[in-house]
């Protein structure tokens, strides 16, 4: 299975609709809280990487699944932020593609040379 951005947003809309009375929907003023919850999930991703390590993530199916579940939680909260601000899959895809094209032309070493005293 390969989920598209529209699929992710649709699934998250379905979850939000199911819990509308408890969670309050996705008005713009909820975006900040959803982003903060997502940062908490990023902390869980960091914990797995820090405590389990690369080798276990690559070779232990249980650890790998746990990492992926936490990454999915992060993506779900990002989808909530998009829903809160009414960002469509098409709008996001357009901006993402443009950002990628711009990044492909950037010279990150030169842009950040001052941070590394000339060492990449």
Locate predicted features.
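Flexible "arm" and connector segments at domain edges
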Residues: 1-120
